Amino acid sequence: LKALVFERNLPRWAASRGASALAGTGRGVRVGPLRLVDMEPPLLPGPEWVSVRPTLAGICGSDLATLDGRSSRYFEDVVSFPFVPGHEVVGEVEGSRVVIEPVLGCAARGIVPPCSACAQGHTGSCERVAFGHLQPGLQTGYCTDTGGGWSNTLVAHHSQLHPVPDSMTDEAAVMVEPTACAVHAVLAADIQEGSTVAVLGAGTLGLCTVAALRHLRLPGAVVAGAKHPEQRRLAADLGADLVAEPGQVRRTVRRQTRSLTVGDRLTGGADVVIDCVGSAASVEEALAVVRPAGKV
C-alpha cells in the first residue's frame, strides 16, 4: 500500500511553519512531517466496515494548513498519529462508486447508546470522537486506524458511505463533502427572503457557499470577499451580486445596506455573515459587517 503519512514530528512541523511563512502556501510540505511510504493496509475494525479504494481525494484548506504547519494544535488531542490525510474522497467498494461522509461518530466507533448529538443526527458534533474502539480522530483522514484518501486503501463504516449516481463524474463527486458543508451552513443560518448575506473568503468552501445561496434563491444580495482575481471571477460567475477584495468588504456592505460608519463598525450591515476563512481576523471582520441582532 502506497500512502502519504503525516507523522508527529515537532521539529519538522516547526520547519514547515517557517518555510510557509517565508516562501508562501504549500512550501512547508517539502520540509514537514509528510512522507510517501509503503505500509500495510488498515485492518477492518469490525463487521460493519469495508475497504475503500480511493479514486480521487481532495486537498482541503485544513490539509494545506496542516502541511504548512499553520493549523492550530488545539485539536491535537482528537487526532491520532501517524495518520493518512484525505477526507474528501470518492472511491470504489466492490465495484460500486461511493463518497465518504468523513466524521467518525458514535456509530462508527461502536458506542451504544450514542451521545446526545449523534442521537439527534448531528454527527458532526459528536462528543465521543476520542473514544470507542477507534483511536482518536475527528474524521477519516485524521485517525490512524482508518487511513485516508491520500492512499491506495482506506476503511470506512457503512454509515459513512453514500452511493454515487452514474450521472456524476468522479471530479464532481469529490466535491460532495465541501459542498455539503456549504449547504449545511446556509440552511442552518435560516436566511430570510430578501436578506443581505456576506460571505467572507472565496476558497472552495466560500465559492460553494455562494453557489448554495444562489441555488436556494433566498438572499436579496450576496456580497463575497475574495482575495485573488480568479476567486473574484468565480464568485461572480457563481452568483455573487457584489465581489470585493478583503479590505473593501466593509465599504461594499455599507453601500449595499446604506449603513453609516461609527469608528470601524457599521450602524447597520449584513443580515447574515458566513465566515469561510475561520481566522481571528475573519471573525473580527464578520462582527464588524453584521447588523445589530444579525447572524454570524
How should these model regions be labeled?
Residues T196-A202, R214-V283:
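Adenosine-nucleotide cofactor-binding segment
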Residues G86, G206-L207:
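N-terminal Rossmann-fold NAD(P) dinucleotide-binding loop
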Residues E76, H87, C106-L200:
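NAD(P)H dinucleotide-binding glycine-rich loop of Rossmann-like/cofactor-binding domains
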Residues T196, G294-K295:
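Short glycine-centered segments of the SAM/dcSAM-binding site in methyltransferase folds
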Residues S62-D68:
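Cytochrome P450 core scaffold surrounding the K-helix E-X-X-R motif
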Residues V290-P292:
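Helix-to-beta-strand junctions that scaffold the AdoMet/dcAdoMet cofactor pocket
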Residues E40-A57, S72-Q120, G124, P165-S167:
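Glycine-rich beta-strand-centered segment in the early N-terminal region that forms part
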Residues C60, L205, E230:
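Conserved Rossmann-like nucleotide-cofactor binding loop
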